Amino acid sequence: MLRLIGVGCLALSAIMTSCNDTDDNPEYREAAVTNLVTYVGMTDGAVFDYISIDDATPARLYTGVQMDGNVVAGQRYLMTYIPVGGDESASGFVEPTSLAAVTTMDVSDKDISRYPDWDKSGVYLLSAWRAGSYLNIRCKLAFSESPRVLALVPSAEDEGVLYLVHQAPADATFDRVYYISFDLTRYLSEHQSLDAIEVHINNTNLKENVLTFLL
């Protein structure tokens, strides 16, 4: 059973402004972005990688943030910061103005035959995209402090076919926005011939229930 980490209603790559005027132009404000990043370790401060989409070159982001010793490499975060030189693809030192842990999971080692009612609870899908080895989901789910079943589960028969299993607790009430990152590394290493994955989802938003992601 899983307890989701909620991050509120931050919009991915939402443009915000800082309060730093430049000497040359007091009207100028540097644009900040909010992106999903991957914690890779510590070098004086926490270091993160950012991949925008698909197989874009990672931007290595160095910060002065001191992380809890229990945080492991691969944990995903939603980070707001001003990009290096205003370029999101550039590596260098950044100063996060917010940093929120995001639910991060591997593909399940069970198969979908274990979940005959895999689509019992709907997922209001807002967006889904692959960034490197991560499949990212931004969605609305009914809020509850009770554990729920949420997993990306492979088909028992069809290679490259996965199911987003969601079974919400009975006391779930109002909807809340969540980001979820699934690490595909292990699954793809076991299925190296794939050129795409197909994800089935009980999507209560646009009724697009099968999503295809090229690899």
Regions found by a protein language model. Name each.
Residues I15-S18:
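C-terminal motif of bacterial Sec signal peptides marking the signal peptidase cleavage site
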